[in-house]
Amino acid sequence: MSEVKKIATRESYGNALVEIGKEHEDLVVLDADLAGATKTAIFQKVFPERHIDCGIAEGNMMGVAAGLATTGKVPFASSFAMFAAGRAFEQIRNSIGYPHLNVKIGATHAGISVGEDGATHQCNEDIALMRMIPGMVIINPADDVEARAAVKAAYEYVGPVYMRFGRLAIPVFNDESTYKFELGKGVVLREGSDVAIFATGLEVYESMQAAEMLAADGINAKVINIHTIKPLDEELVVASAKECKKVVTVEEHSIIGGLGSAVCDTLCANYPTPVLKIGVNDVYGESGPAVQLVKKYGLDAESIYTKVRAFLA
């Protein structure tokens, strides 16, 4: 059996910017002295006149992006998730969110899979921060195919968008020839009636693998890819809860304020259902190889399988 192709979604981001930039001259890319790491250097190499390095000044970068948006440009402001959502939160809130400007934020190196950079750079709080900004769209793609499609969808959408990309190369499981990205709509990857598993980002593939293990035990898990966390596909969430009676959420993010919280908010208001939230518990990360950290923090397929089995017992 051939090995599964793996690509980091941060690389997908850089490649997608070039694809869009070839067709749309209004696209401008900004970075904060991290073009090599965020992969916007791919765009910079092709369109140097449309790439602006703002230096290590993320807040200023967001302000520059906001200004460009008022002139009709479509700016993509790029940095690590910790520095974009974290350090520049005030500028995103007040300069981009409040006036609802057409700025796209490309946040790379999100989650525990940043690896050796350690707790200071492993942003497990960004989705929670961005969810609280009125009108902010949040996208967390699951693989290369979805990531490139998501960047294009973000460009076409008029309004602020926060996109979350990873450092770790992850399996590409979507078929580019048939895949279609629809903003705000979840994707059912596997049907089942015993439990509904809502996953996002790199946890989608892990959840699919966990579902295979559960199937071997006679447990039929429905797996849903939630690439758009805001606006959430509430209709699909409620329908799946009614069908399966128990719900699991899986995310490479804190269990506080992320996908799990969004799903719980929806179910509390519409169809109260037992929910197991799998993610980073209320702790900081640590330095180590990304794959080992994913396993240590209980986010690999085997850990998901074990937790779901216990939840259903």
How would you name each of these model-derived features?
Residues 1-164, 169, ...:
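Thiamine diphosphate
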